[in-house]
Amino acid sequence: MRALVISGGGSKGAYAGGVAHYLIRHQHTKYDLFLGSSTGSLLLPHLALGNLNKLYNIYTNVNQNSIFSLNPFRVKRKDNREFVSINYVNSLLQFIKRKRTFGESKNLRQLIRKNFSEAEFQKARTNAKDIVVTVSNLTKNKVEYKSIQECTYNDFCEWIWISCNYVPFMSLVEKDGFEYADGGFGCLIPIREAIRRGATEIDAIILESENMEHNKILGKNPFSLMVGLFSFMMDQTERHNIVEGKLAAINKEVTLNLYYTPSKLTENSLIFNKKLMRSWWKQGYAYAERKAQQAKDNELK
């Protein structure tokens, strides 16, 4: 049983889309299981349906307004570079309303429903053995995995949205009496869960470079420093998940194929730049193509 697993990574999901595009469309790889966290959860239903052109259009046409109903960031462009700072007005509004997050991502919830219909939901349930999204239950202090086979359409759309909510910059969601946030806080790349669900071969797309050692530019104010600290903690979670996944794969004799980004794509994956995301999609496609050619060359030797 073959599984496709995609990590979290915000706007870097466009790169994962490019890799998956090559694997599904040009290598004709058939997957039984689809598992993801955060932006990976957004990709899964469309990949299970084979809606690659639709997915490309979604990922290369979103902007900050597509995601945030209240944007906590201000993006300034200077000399073809982007500089991110806090949106003091919006953050102040949140404090006045006694909200616990700097921003809100209700527009993303609408975007998910707009691009994933109930008919597509039913078809996805039939096409794949399972589609699983990762969420973090902050109340219970545990990671949960939500299967499309166990959800209604409304619930599954809600879980996809929750899986992407990078608190405290996006919405903190209360559901079924518990408070939930981004699945990446607990498990950024659910390789081990794919093995637990019976996968015998896994293609895992990791939205980070294989060598995660690079110098970060730390923010000059508390808000941007917080963004950097969260990024650091997520990197450590990802390292742990990958090691854990590799060990589980060895133990269960599972074939594990890892697809990394060739370099650090961005310092802030909550900034959605159409031009960059189009470029990342192409980079992901080219990387998967090169990796396939290298594997073919090694077989011939």
List where the protein language model places each region.
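Patatin-like phospholipase
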Residues: 1-37, 45-301
